[in-house]
Amino acid sequence: ATKSPYLIATSTIGYVQVRPCPALAMKVIRLPAIHHDGNAVLVSGQLGHILVDAGTSWYQSLQVERIRGQINDASIDRILLTSRRFPVSGGALHIAQAFGDVPIHIHCDGQSAMETGDFFTTWASRFDSDMPQTPTVEVEENEIIPLGDGELQAIALPGHSPDGLGYHIPHLSTLIVGTLLPRADRPTRWDLPGGSLLDIVASFQTMKRMNLKSIVPLQGPAIRGQEHIQEVLSRHLDFFLEAVNNDGQPPTSWHRPAATALWLTPLAPWPLKEQESV
């Protein structure tokens, strides 16, 4: 069976049978966040289609239709999650079932919360929502998921959540980060279950070293351009380092975040070049 030209070996995902697809350039399509949802990102290559993050359960049926609108009669092959948090994971089970029970992958530190439907550490409780009990498969740090004409690599980016991952597309110098970077003008919170300010600092230092050309944040359009990305990451990193020196606290003048917000809101707005088009 492993002699098939359409079987690709990976470390924990195992052998994945895929059908040959027309020779198309790899595509990365952002499905814009709706309301409390995070961005969902459809990555398509010669060997199939992968969905990175799924949004909440609130718009899961609409999410399925949006995906089908992009891939027509094809199916996604798997779902990769950047963390357990409800705005990126809540819709994963419904979407997986809609496409024939495709596997859902997450860092091992997030598996128990997903599989038990933990509404506290996923933060679903703050949205007055149940967290679906979601079977998952571990994705390892630095694991490579090939798509034929490109690949995704799982990068450990803990801090907002201990199971935080980013998915790097090396040949496009693109990173999909989820809740670690809510938006260019919104620093992430570290006071949610499992959050760690020091891990956030380390993760932002990791992202700066990658010299990326594009970052897909939790919400809003991609942040583009190496110089602009370095400016955004430095602004966030400097803020987090100041918080470390302030006994792990944000400025007292900043407003308390809403229960559903995964980010802090600066009192004086930070720059935001990326605007969602309607």
Which role does the model predict for each range below?
Residues 56-58, 151-158, 162-244:
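Metallo-beta-lactamase
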Residues 29, 80, 105, 137-139, ...:
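Hydrophobic/aromatic beta-strand patches that form the interior of the parallel beta-sheet core
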Residues 50-53, 75-81, 154-156:
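Short catalytic-loop micro-motif centered on adjacent basic/acidic residues
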Residues 1-24, 45:
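N-terminal amphipathic/basic-hydrophobic helices that include classical n-h-c signal peptides
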Residues 58-61, 68-145, 235-243:
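Active-site HxH/HxHxD metal-binding segment of metal-dependent hydrolases
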Residues 6-16, 201-214, 218-278:
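Accessory terminal helices/loops
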